[in-house]
Amino acid sequence: MDDPTGIAIPRPTQPYAGTTSRLTDDCEPARMVLDGAPEGAPNVVIVLLDDVGFGSFSTFGGPVPAPALERVATDGLRFNQFHTTAICAPTRASLLTGRNHHTVHMGRITEAANSFPAYDTVIPREAATIAEVLRQNGYATGMFGKGHLTPQWEMGPAGPFDRWPTGLGFDRFYGFPGAETSQFEPDLYDQTTPIAPYLGRGDYHLTEDIADRAIDWM
């Protein structure tokens, strides 16, 4: 079925539009068309904060002043019908796939996975993330900060890496794939390579590093 929104993935292979022949002079190559975001396509920035209640910030009437978030909300959209699970990985999986956390096998955090289908923490291939949808429609995609969607047994230095952020639709990943890390000596990765940018720096702080990297990339 044709998708009127143009975001169906994966894109089906199209028949060759050119002509071929035994003689070079009789061949007509097809014009190569690269996937690209449509003209005027907006930039998309999603910010997910752990351990923050819906009514905490002034953005939604809460007591904690958040002028920067208020500016973002004023220039963007406010959604107030999203189900959270009160724990990080299931909520993140729902946000990125647009599906119930049990449907995408993330019924609990990756450290507590078991063999039941809703709890094995292995996101099914048919549940594309918003990053994968955007990437296959011409966007450059990046994740900065906490990943926490990779099964624990795939977190080793030899991979496999297809369920790391770079395998879930993100061209660029800078952050930590686990549940938590130190703000001063973090377990940090650039793509899938472990790095230690804090070495030799007494002023290093992870939050500032993540923000700087994200801004530079954008």
Label the model's feature ranges.
Residues 1-218:
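Formylglycine-dependent sulfatase
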